[in-house]
Regions:
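N-terminal-biased segments
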Residues: 66-108, 228-243, 253-255
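N-terminal metal-binding scaffold of metallo-dependent hydrolase/deaminase domains
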Residues: 1-53, 64-66
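Short coil/turn connectors at secondary-structure junctions
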Residues: 2-3, 54-56, 62, 125-128, ...
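Divalent metal-coordination and catalytic microenvironments
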Residues: 32, 37, 63, 74, ...
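Metal-coordinating catalytic core of metallo-dependent amide/deamination hydrolases
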Residues: 139-256
């Protein structure tokens, strides 16, 4: 958005009182005033008209309720086409649905189109901020950042890191993984409203070498985010126990 925009609607939002506690604000008739795409003021209709000259135009959305955008703190870009894919266990579901969907992102044009569609789907549902798993492909994560940047969306994302227990075309050795990740961090982390998250998928698909790589990258870039999965079902937990017999529990796999 460019220029100045005033929106009239019923408003609901969270704010902080003088003690710093969150309080719920509600205006039966209120205004949100934006300049150059940023909210600069939220106020009642009475206060708005008291300070604005007569005849100033605004967009009237009454009787609709205007609320802050939603935040999705865990979502996978390539799973937009496999929603509700059924399976009895997580590992079987990955083999049947998730991995085949992710293999398609090897195609650069496909990844670019799907990244743009994914961002549009989030925004159309009122989700204005998300933490996203991309795929193992560096160009797919790049396309995601490009699409989010074009819409000035707040996004935390990272390329998925896997080096075992997945289709061979979704595996990446440590050197290539480091190069792709460092390039994405340098280009996108802290750019606009974008941030990078180190993204080892989960312990089943990462060797100790790859997890050590994540630790090293985090030491080099301590302001990065980290996202993964843990303890989603019993079969997965048993598999992790077999792969990492020296660790006392699932969480210690990531901590050590």
């Amino acid at each position: 958005l460019s220029g100045r925009l005033s929106i009239r609607a019923r408003l609901l939002s969270l704010d902080k009182d003088l003690q710093g506690e969150l309080v719920l604000d509600y205006y039966e008739d209120g205004f949100v005033v934006c300049e150059e795409g940023l909210i600069v003021e939220v106020l009642s209709a009475d206060d708005y008209f008291a300070k604005m000259p007569s005849g100033v135009s605004y967009e009237d959305l009454r009787p609709y309720l205007l609320v802050p955008g939603f935040i999705d703190n865990h979502v996978h870009m390539p799973q937009q086409d496999i929603i509700a894919g059924r399976s009895s266990e997580l590992l079987d579901w990955l083999d049947r649905h998730a991995f085949p969907a992710e293999l398609r992102y090897a195609d650069h044009d496909f990844a670019r189109i799907k990244a743009a569609t994914f961002v549009d789907q989030l925004l159309s549902a009122g989700t204005t901020c998300a933490q996203v798993f991309s795929t193992v492909h560096g160009h797919a994560c790049e396309s995601l950042f490009v699409a989010a940047s074009a819409k000035k969306m707040c996004l935390v994302a990272g390329k998925v890191m896997m080096d075992r227990n997945a289709p061979v075309d979704l595996l990446q050795n440590a050197a290539d993984c480091r190069d792709d990740t460092e390039r994405l961090i340098a280009k996108w982390h802290g750019r606009g409203r974008l941030s990078y998250a180190l993204t080892p998928r989960f312990a089943v698909t990462s060797t100790e070498e790859q997890l050590s790589l994540c630790s090293d990258l985090l030491r080099r870039h301590p302001d990065l985010y980290v996202q993964t999965h843990i303890s989603e079902n019993l079969q997965e937990i048993d598999t992790v126990r077999a792969l990492f017999p020296r660790q006392r529990d699932y969480l210690e796999v990531y901590e050590h």
